[in-house]
Amino acid sequence: QQTRLATSTDGLYFTPQAPLLGPPYFRATRLDGVIYLSMWEGRLGRMTSWEGPVELAPPIHDGYHLPPHVSGRDSGQPGRQIRHGHIFAHDGRIHMTFSRIGDAPERCLHCEVVPADDWADWRFGPVSDLLRPAPSWEGGDLPMRPSIMGTAWDRLHELRDPALFTDNGQVYMAYCGGAESGLGIARVDGL
């Protein structure tokens, strides 16, 4: 999979543009004239136009794109990585929400990001829980075990793929519950 820009005049039918922009699962936000990107496995990027070009962040954290406290590599548990991060500008700050493969339970996490011109100077705040699986459709009534990479064919004790958005000034988070068996929206206060 790759990412391209697609345009629409009516919001229903889209025309993909020719150039590939980069890796899969782009999520984008704009702050101070810069479009910040998050992609598969926590890769980060930026651009100044929706048409590109994309400047991809180098793997500056011992060969990884994110510091250990964000990616989960500091846990001592092998195989932990960001599944789908979402980068979001709100009130002049950049927020990153994500879930991590290998967490038990996989859940919606958050950290604040302070970007800089030099990728090595980017700062990532502490990671905190935004939401954990509740009983019923979110899977909180099921056994808890470390999540694995790939499609979830059954309902599991996991929340995945958080994405923040605003509506009438209120921040909300869309997410997958029960691993991939349902979609939820939760109000987020305090960002």
Model-derived features with residue positions:
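Non-cytosolic head/periplasmic domains of membrane-anchored proteins
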Residues: 160-162
